[in-house]
Each structure stands twice: as structure tokens, then as C-alpha cells.
Amino acid sequence: MSGKCRKIMYALVVTVFAAFLWMICCENDRKVSDKAIGETTVQSMRSGEKSVSLEQSDIPKIEIEDLTDAFTVILQYASKDMLAGCTVDESFLMWFYAQYGRDAVIHIAFDVLDGGNDPDVWYEETGNSIHVLWLLYCRDSGFGQHELENVYWMQTAAASEMVFGFAGDINFAENWYTTEYMKEQPDGLWDCFSEDLLAQMQGVDVMIMNNEFTYVNKKGATSVYGKAYTFRADPQKAELLEIFGTDTVTLANNHVYDYGKRGLLSTLDALDQEGIPYSGAGRNLKDASKIIYYVMNGRKVAFVSATQIERSKQYTKAATETEPGVLKALHPEKFLKIVEEAAQNSDYVIAEVHWGTEGMLYPDQSQRHLAEQIAQAGADVIIGGHPHRLQGAAFVGDVPIAYSLGNFWFSTGTLYTTLSKVTITEDGTVKLSFVPCIQQNLTTRILTEPEERSDFYEYLASISADIGIDVDGVVYHKSADDYPAEEILYDSDTSRTDIIGIADNEGDAIDIVGNLKEDR
């Protein structure tokens, strides 16, 4: 039997089973007792009542006597926000009933009648958000299989939180400083990072790296004419990403097209060979624009990325309907629509953007403006890169921003860098934190000495805007109502309007990409 036939047969079985359950429900579950609907429902019922009548301004008087009534309430009166855009119908509700039981259905219906229409009620009842429930339904029923594309089901280290890790620029390019140093080490790339740093990277639930070069064989490869820096790595080096515990890479940068169309396609092939999903570039615009979804702890998290660079000379080609390239955000309308789509189809959105100006300590006006647009489009946190310097943190409303993670392992200069973590807690709080690191002598390590750590966080606070930093490197918005002033160790007293630009070149000793000028 073909795969298509199997899907059709499976769908028929599910439909018949749903109809069978429906008849059972109507025959045997006519009344909803106090015990069945639980204490919360009992509070809304008068003692001895056989049904519940609630009246809302926009909902007629409804009596829930059985599951048919409950289904009617949900299907007719649940808000779009509560259903989160999912095409919930009787088939979905029968599947939901089969999985979670009558009480869960009744509680959902009463939330609608109570005027709550809170999408979190699905998670509270089942441990899965409506977005995850919809994916499970599609997976089990055989319907809406396109919904399962680019969805990755992940295991978390802790049931109470989801942790994403992000690092700045890395470079495996041939004849580049980092790669030449790696070749000299007994254990190669392992010797280029401290053990505790690699352990933390491998320990997060999802590790996302910025692939700031292209994978293509030397034979026949031609770099883009006129570009000052072009980076090419042997495709076999893609396997090195495993050392970082890499789950996804962003290709939305200004070097993935250094060797033209051939180089980009070779890069995509190399990542496909390693089974590593990529974002922000692709074989066409659809591929470059795809949203990656992670399902963990009953929540669905979206990841999107784009590049604002280059601004003048367009060495890096934008993807089109038929041609490979990157997803550009210099004119951000397309990217903002993707962020909006991600927000509509997930519980949280993480956006990563290649932006800013090389060598700058502070974000420029274009970064700030784009950050505001991305936040308004629905992102819950924004991660930045490209300036080859660690830039500070800030907030747009309640959306935390890491403007630039800097060079993670890219250059010869001594520069602060970080492993940035995005933690989503069980109660839905999104936290951005920074692990203090330094790139020095072509090796990157965590700063472990108390004085070193203090210096790092004081520096981070000094280049940030309107934030406080606690002992764990978590940043907080000083204007937030729940700002934990008593827990703050490092305080930024700088207004985000006070600082723009300012190069960090250590007295002109380091160039804009982070190399010591004496090494060139």
C-alpha cells in the first residue's frame, strides 16, 4: 500500500472512531455532575442543579448538560485568540476528548462561558498549549501534514524550563587564523574552548550557531569579486558543529554567499548531510523564509532569522522565488510578515538578526528601529550579530534584546564574548542571560574568577541601556513593574537614547573584524 493510501485509510479510521465516540458520549454522558467538572465548576453551580446557565453580553444563555453542549459552546463561542488560529472542529474535539477525557472538555467550555477565552486554559488542562495540541492532532489523524514541516520535537533537561543557547561568530575557513590555530592543537577544536563552556553549550536544550562562512570545495570555487573578506571551509568541517551541540544554524549573514550561488548550495548540502536544520538562507525564498519550530514541555517555540547586511554593495544575494540566497531585512516588510506568522502559529518567537556596523560597541539607529518593528510584529526575544563586538542589552517593552554577541571564535584580538541563553520558564516568563566569556589567543573560555566575572558584567552593564543584571547574568528591564531591585548586582544607568556607535579598537590595535592589526 502506498504512503498516500495509508494516510487516507488512517484518516477514515480516525473519522469512524470519532463518530463512534460521539455516539457513546451522547448516549452515556448526558449529565455533567459536580464531581465530573471539578471544584472550579462546582463553585459556579448552585447545589442540586443539573445544568449550569451563564449569561455574557456576547454569549446567549447556555445550559451544558452533555458533551454535545460543551462542543457547541467551544465551536461557536471560543475566541480566535483562544483557538490561536487553529481550525478547531468536531473532529479535533473528539480527538481531544479521546486523549484527555470529558472533564477537560467541560472545563474548556466553562472557560468560554465564563468569558475567559484564555488560550492558556488548554495548557492548564493538558500540559500542552493549543498549538502543540493541534500538532499532535495532525500527527495522529493524518490531516494537515504540512503543519508538521520544520517541526522538531525536543527533550528538555528540566520539565520546569526550556533553554536556548546562542553564540556569536565562528569561522572554520581555510587559511584563517582560527582554523590554522585549530590544526596545531592535539585535539583540534576541542582545545580551542574551555571544557566548561562546551559542557554548557551541549547542556542547553537547543543550541543555535551563526555559520559565518561557506562550506564549499576549493576546486572550482570562485569568491565574489571585490569583497574584502571571503571565507571558505571544506564541507567536511560541518561535522565540527557537533562539538558545540549544535541543533540549528542561522545562515542569515553576509558571508554565506562569499562563493556565490555554488558556495551557498554547497553549504546547504553540507548541513543537510549532517542533519542540521538551517534558517535565514535557502535554495529559494520559500526555503530561506521557513520558520523552524521546536516543541518542548508542551510549548511550541518559533525561530526565525534574517540579515540587514549588506547595506550598500549587495555581494550577498537575496533569495528569490527561483534563486538561492539569504532572507534580507534591509527593507524588512517580508521578514516582519514572517515574524507575524511565527507569532500566530507558536507560543513564543525568537528572532535572530544580522545587523549593525562592524567594530561598534553600541547599536546604531537602524538596529534600534528594526528591533522595535520586530518586537511589535510578535517576537518575544531578539538576538543580534555582525558587529564583531559584544554589544549591550536593552528592552523594547518587555522584549529583551541582545544587540550583538560578538566574536565567539573568529579573530586574534582579545574581546569579550558570551554564550547567551534564552530561558522560558514553566509560568511563561522569558529570560535573557549572558554567560561571561572571553576570546583570547584564539581560545574562548568562560570567565570563572570572581573578579573576572564582575568586570565582565560591569562592562556589559556599562554598554547596555536601562537594565539590571543579577548574579546569574539575567538581565531585567529597570522600568518593569516586577524589577527585582534587591537582586541586581550590576546596574546600567545609561538611557538607550544616550549612546550610538563608538568603535572599540583598543587604541587602533584591533581592526573592525576583531583581529590584531599586527597579525595582518
PLM feature segments, named:
Residues G85-V151:
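Pan-zinc metallopeptidase signature
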Residues M9, C25, G38, P60-E63, ...:
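Residues marking helix boundaries in flexible regions
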Residues M1-S47, S53:
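Gram-positive cell-envelope targeting signals
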Residues Q43, G48-L83:
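Zinc-dependent metallopeptidase catalytic helix centered on the HExxH motif
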